[in-house]
């Protein structure tokens, strides 16, 4: 029996950072730092598959903190994510990394929720930062990106934008920072019927 495409109905938000004095070329921050960031984000035992940034309306109100979802995690499972994550080397002049994910929801002419989008943010800083800087920069750039996604589609904003962010001040040679949405539950759209 055929079935249609899958779409997520339950998600969680999370974030993590990692740093190390060790790493393997060509991207040394991908080795140990990335694993440490996944561990801190509590998603280290998944096989991560990245998405682009389109959200079904069924996710509205169903995006939870990661700690509410960990009891449902399955070691070795595939976790589909929207992730803002990057690494850096301090010898390249980066002292801090900030990341964020923002969410917007659109409405139709009657004010009804129709669909959503996400946007990712990554910024490198030549000096250490604090949470206030990380949050303000994430919101500033994500707000611009989310509004662009709505404007591009000629869709009005349904509700307030949501923002999640994270940052690291790199104290070792290499660092990695990530903010992510992970998708846990799914349903299927109706299958296509071609006559």
From Swiss-Prot:
Q: Which compartments is it annotated to reside in?
A: Cytoplasm
Function noted in UniProt: Part of the AaxABC system, catalyzes the decarboxylation of L-arginine. The arginine uptake by the bacterium in the macrophage may be a virulence factor against the host innate immune response.
**Post-translational modification Pyruvic acid (Ser), affected residues:** 53
UniProt GO BP: arginine catabolic process
Q: Which domain of life is it from?
A: Bacteria
Main subcellular location: cytoplasm
By what name is this protein known? Pyruvoyl-dependent arginine decarboxylase AaxB
Instruction: Fetch the InterPro entries from UniProt.
Output: Pyr-dep_his/arg-deCO2ase (IPR016104), Pyr-dep_his/arg-deCO2ase_sand (IPR016105), Pyruvoyl-dep_arg_deCO2ase (IPR002724)
| Reactions the enzyme catalyzes | L-arginine + H(+) = agmatine + CO2
The positions annotated as site (Cleavage (non-hydrolytic)) read: 52-53
Entry GO terms, CC? cytoplasm
Per the record, the similarity remark reads: Belongs to the pyruvoyl-dependent arginine decarboxylase family.
Q: Which Gene3D superfamilies match?
A: Pyruvoyl-Dependent Histidine Decarboxylase, subunit B (3.50.20.10)
